[in-house]
Amino acid sequence: MDHCGALFLCLCLLTLQNATTETWEELLSYMENMQVSRGRSSVFSSRQLHQLEQMLLNTSFPGYNLTLQTPTIQSLAFKLSCDFSGLSLTSATLKRVPQAGGQHARGQHAMQFPAELTRDACKTRPRELRLICIYFSNTHFFKDENNSSLLNNYVLGAQLSHGHVNNLRDPVNISFWHNQSLEGYTLTCVFWKEGARKQPWGGWSPEGCRTEQPSHSQVLCRCNHLTYFAVLMQLSPALVPAELLAPLTYISLVGCSISIVASLITVLLHFHFRKQSDSLTRIHMNLHASVLLLNIAFLLSPAFAMSPVPGSACTALAAALHYALLSCLTWMAIEGFNLYLLLGRVYNIYIRRYVFKLGVLGWGAPALLVLLSLSVKSSVYGPCTIPVFDSWENGTGFQNMSICWVRSPVVHSVLVMGYGGLTSLFNLVVLAWALWTLRRLRERADAPSVRACHDTVTVLGLTVLLGTTWALAFFSFGVFLLPQLFLFTILNSLYGFFLFLWFCSQRCRSEAEAKAQIEAFSSSQTTQ
């Protein structure tokens, strides 16, 4: 009888082992079928995914964990107890299946679960729990209405048996690595929210997740719940075609060099004729000085961003470049304000120590803004990568070029684009008002056609003086991108040269008027 009982027990164990093996085979077969049927509807995809989750939660396996893997799906299951102290998983330690084209080399990922994970579940059911993780290396099961681009096309999911996990005080950390720098991209940690945005399957949502970027190639997601996670990638700036990089660089180099020489000549001529200068000329010279500083800092910026140069030197040059740009924009606005005083307030425009006060504003305010940015966080300045794509590869490949510039998206949005936008808007309004005022004055003249050429020169000069060409920076999108790149590069790299031409024309005009007054005075004296 004892022998019969032992034999019966052995048969039961063998049967249980065979059933467990069949379950693993069924799971693996099901995962392979999911890859074959991935082109079906989103509703069918959700059913497949939920079925895989239930199979992982209910399957039996010996030991602590179970790992199953196909070329694009990896499933893991872990047995947890209420004394759970945390769990860390990395793609480097997991068994990986070689993929065609070396797709596994795109990047790595990791998940870190806190000890708090099992707290609520153990309060209601203090028994063994099951944690499952499902990793996808494609996005076929998570298509939203925007066809969003995901970092490495990775989707990492996790679920705990016996209820949902939400509002964790110690978040789940999900890390993604890429084999190239991610600068130039807006990266957002998101999770798959079923039924979101009126979609039958769901959509990506950033709720409950915080995005951090510890390095140029890593994204860290801190989320207070469990679900399927990914990182959305969006291009911050419009990508520059690689074949246009060389001509744009050459134009910038030549244009800025010409502007530097022209600005130096203008400043030297000003010091030579300093006794004859007035407040208007001194304001022009401050604008020339800011443009000179801007061009010099801009030409040095790419060289200082290279690796042999210390990072502190690049940070200092980036701050100097930002300061020069803010000073240049401020002096453009001062030119607009001064033009308003000249045309609008014909009488009583004397302001005590006028040029000195403008100098404090033009040079002091930008310095204060830059120092404030540095005091808040010194890393706002440094090497900044500009993404450049290769159109011969259909935009799939990109390379990077670096300059010393503003690295913080907030500082760039507020103190570069916002500051420049307000300055350009103010000067465009002043320019329109000045042209309307000049037209009204010309209508009162006896022979307006005689002044047509002079008015054209005046309009072009005012356009240059007020820096309205810098407004082209806000047209770098869509069909305007390529024309904007060349127009902005040509016009603004030669900005110092155009100011030099304006200075020369104004100088010749003032000398001609002075000569005419002397001749008129001499003729009147002769007549008497």
From Swiss-Prot:
InterPro entries: GAIN_B, GAIN_dom_sf, GPCR_2-like_7TM, GPCR_2_secretin-like, GPR1/GPR3/GPR5, GPS
Family annotation (SMART domains): GPS (SM00303)
Keywords in alphabetical order: Cell membrane, Disulfide bond, G-protein coupled receptor, Glycoprotein, Membrane, Receptor, Signal, Transducer, Transmembrane, Transmembrane helix
GO molecular function: G protein-coupled receptor activity
Chief place where the protein resides: membrane
Alphabetized Gene3D superfamilies for the sequence: 2.60.220.50, Rhodopsin 7-helix transmembrane proteins
GO cellular component, one term: membrane
Protein name: Adhesion G-protein coupled receptor G5
